[in-house]
């Protein structure tokens, strides 16, 4: 054998050995089944994975070849698993109806195979019906090769996943059915007449009436921060009473990988008396940001480093509707056993404002919304028929209400029996109503006032007759979605509280987390990519994604259409585009893109913009991202609030290899290749 040939063979063997060493095969078997679980003291049938609720942690290293066999043992239900935030071939993404993937039939097995091309904190969940809510979700962590930290600042002695989720005693199917019957079905913390009086005292009667008239005409609730309530919030599958605990020793650094795996809940996260340093967002490394708290949207992830010094710290994740907490403990294992948790006092709940609707209180700008109440058939607006509502105005001491001058108000107040609201305590409220001429105070439209309407004879509550009340606000011209202060959503969490604490107190504005003075809450504008972005091109074009809905029928839309009515977004492979999310609704939407990372336009230089797979779009606001379409396939883009997606807020983004009009599968669907050495530039650092 010649020396030259021997040299070539040695090189070949060396390359093969190197490839073999670097590309370890990591295999898992996951069995999906229905079993009885007991989370809240009531045995319930829920979905388990490998007999566990919640599903087990999956761990990989960057460069591994993942082989995951999923066995569906559910009766009469197809299933699926989506690998949330992972860059992989489209057919491995796990969304039925996309990329020629049909789901996993009962008693069948599907083998997911893909190259692990990134590192970071991610998770996995079903993309079939409401199975995610019912238990099919779990954490997924990818370590850098050989678990070497990316920076010295990320080096930690302990590493814990903190999986936040919401558990309901009703199944996902029951919840969706209830929302379809009545969108406000779970709104059990509506405002009362006393909230109205508090607003009058603060803003004055005229401003209060104007504000509430607009909300009533839209038939929306200021309290609608979350569509579904009555959740028990879990941390790593444990209730607050069960108290998940992570141990440490004095002097150690601890990495906490927060994952919001809830179906419908956003959380404000804090560890009182312990500073956190954010080092990763959505699995992607960012420059360190010291914070005291952060808001985490559904499907987002944040990694933080902490250096605990006390014996115990309580991890608190409070739902933004202030209905409960997910709680756990950090405990110094060399000290006495941790005591039972202390339930924190809820922070004041936030009420939505007209600014959250992007309207600046000018109803004339709401073109496209038909507020002609004459279409509300069956509603007798003669207030004399509203028996059971006793508003004795004579008891409102100190309030100079000359009712005779209130033209346009035909309300026989004497007949409103049964509402025992003693106004005698409202002294000092001098509201001259003579200036309120011409105001049509149709009190029958005061939705959101928690009064039993069963006694209000003559009112037909069949809302199907309310023609023209389509809450898809994409047609509401004149709505000023001011982006100047947003740049990708700046969560102004400064405290504007009416009181220091207490669940009955309120603050105003979706973004108001009641952060105590002097403490730092993470803003989207704080996030910078740890390493410079490789693609800083300006976008070639913009795709507008308007988020709206019709609350009377509980329908959620993108650009005015439900998923089954939409045309896919089509993008050329390699194209640089801007995605413009415009929220025309009164609720926040965490918008998630499969298959690729977006760069959030948050005021940072293009080279420093952070990568995100999910962005919160607050009510009435606009958020923009940049995207390099460098992954072939059909990719879901949707709201990650489960019931919003199920009700229609979803579309398909097709990245094609040829012209943008092609949908030929051979040009779109990238087949799996476990030897793929390509690296997505937005996922690898």
Which role does the model predict for each range below?
Residues 1-9:
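Bacterial N-terminal signal peptides that target proteins for export
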Residues 571, 577, 582-591, 596-657, ...:
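C-terminal soluble interaction/assembly domains
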Residues 18-19:
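N-terminal signal peptide c-region/cleavage motif recognized by signal peptidases
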Residues 95-100, 277-307, 562-565, 603-624:
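A cross-kingdom feature marking solvent-exposed beta-strand/loop segments within repeated
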Residues 23-270, 274-296, 335-372, 382, ...:
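Histidine-centered copper-binding motifs that mark active-site loops
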Residues 27-29, 138-198, 289-576, 630-634, ...:
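Extended terminal and domain-junction accessory segments
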Residues 92, 266-287, 321-332, 588-611, ...:
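Extended intrinsically disordered, low-complexity coil regions enriched in Ser, Thr, Gly, Ala
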Residues 238-267, 271, 533, 537-551, ...:
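Surface-exposed interaction/gating patches
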């Amino acid at each position: 054998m010649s020396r030259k040939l021997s040299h070539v063979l040695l090189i070949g063997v060396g390359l093969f050995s190197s490839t073999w060493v670097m590309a370890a095969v990591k295999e898992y078997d996951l069995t999906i089944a229905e079993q009885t679980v007991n989370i809240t003291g009531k045995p319930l049938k829920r979905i388990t994975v490998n007999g566990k609720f919640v599903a087990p942690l999956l761990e990989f290293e960057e460069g591994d070849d993942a082989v995951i066999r999923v066995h569906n043992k559910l009766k009469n239900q197809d299933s699926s698993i989506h690998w949330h935030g992972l860059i992989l071939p489209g057919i491995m993404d796990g969304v039925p109806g996309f990329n020629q993937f049909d789901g996993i039939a009962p008693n069948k097995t599907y083998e997911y195979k893909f190259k692990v091309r990134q590192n970071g904190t991610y998770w996995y969940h079903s993309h079939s019906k409401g199975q995610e809510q019912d238990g099919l979700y779990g954490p997924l962590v990818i370590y850098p090769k050989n678990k070497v930290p990316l920076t010295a600042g990320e080096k930690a002695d302990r590493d814990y996943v903190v999986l936040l989720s919401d558990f309901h005693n009703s199944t996902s199917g029951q919840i969706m059915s209830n929302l379809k019957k009545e969108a406000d079905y779970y709104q059990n913390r509506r405002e009362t007449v006393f909230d109205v009086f508090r607003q009058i005292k603060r803003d004055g009667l005229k401003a209060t009436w104007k504000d509430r008239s607009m909300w009533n005409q839209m038939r929306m609730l200021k309290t609608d921060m979350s569509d579904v309530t009555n959740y028990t919030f879990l941390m790593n599958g444990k209730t607050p009473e069960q108290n998940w605990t992570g141990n440490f020793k004095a002097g150690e650094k601890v990495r906490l990988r927060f994952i919001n795996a809830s179906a419908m809940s956003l959380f404000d996260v804090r560890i009182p008396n312990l500073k956190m340093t954010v080092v990763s967002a959505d699995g992607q490394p960012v420059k360190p940001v010291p914070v005291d708290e952060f808001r985490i949207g559904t499907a987002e992830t944040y990694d933080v480093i902490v250096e605990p010094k006390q014996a115990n710290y309580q991890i608190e994740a409070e739902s933004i509707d202030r209905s409960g907490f997910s709680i756990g403990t950090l405990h110094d294992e060399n000290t006495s056993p941790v005591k039972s948790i202390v339930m924190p006092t809820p922070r004041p709940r936030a009420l939505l404002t007209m600014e959250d609707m992007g309207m600046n209180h000018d109803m004339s700008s709401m073109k496209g919304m038909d507020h002609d109440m004459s279409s509300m058939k069956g509603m007798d607006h003669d207030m004399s028929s509203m028996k059971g509502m006793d508003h004795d105005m004579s008891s409102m001491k100190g309030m100079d209400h000359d009712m005779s001058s209130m033209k346009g108000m035909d309300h026989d107040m004497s007949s409103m029996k049964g509402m025992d609201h003693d106004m005698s305590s409202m002294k000092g409220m001098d509201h001259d109503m003579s200036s309120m001429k011409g105001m049509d105070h149709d009190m029958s439209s005061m939705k959101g006032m928690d009064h039993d309407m069963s006694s209000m004879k003559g009112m037909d509550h069949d809302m199907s007759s309310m023609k023209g009340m389509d809450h898809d606000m994409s047609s509401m011209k004149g709505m000023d979605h001011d982006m100047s202060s947003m740049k990708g959503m700046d969560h102004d969490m400064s405290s504007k509280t009416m009181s220091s604490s207490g669940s009955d107190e309120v603050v105003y504005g979706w973004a108001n987390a009641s952060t105590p003075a002097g403490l730092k809450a993470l803003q989207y504008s704080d996030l910078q990519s740890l390493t410079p972005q490789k693609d800083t091109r300006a976008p070639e074009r913009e795709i507008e994604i308007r988020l709206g809905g019709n609350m009377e029928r509980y329908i959620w839309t993108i650009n005015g259409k439900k998923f089954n009515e939409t045309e896919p977004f089509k993008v050329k492979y390699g194209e640089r585009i801007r995605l413009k999310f415009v929220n025309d609704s009164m609720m926040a939407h965490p918008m998630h893109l499969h298959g690729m990372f977006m760069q959030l336009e948050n005021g940072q230089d293009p080279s420093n913009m952070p990568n995100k797979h999910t962005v919160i779009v607050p009510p009435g606001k606009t958020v923009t991202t940049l995207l390099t379409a460098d992954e072939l396939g059909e990719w879901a883009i949707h709201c990650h609030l489960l019931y919003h997606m199920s009700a229609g807020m979803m579309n398909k983004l097709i990245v094609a290899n040829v012209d943008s009009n092609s949908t030929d599968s051979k040009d779109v669907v990238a087949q799996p290749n476990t030897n793929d050495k390509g690296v997505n530039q937005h996922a690898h650092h």
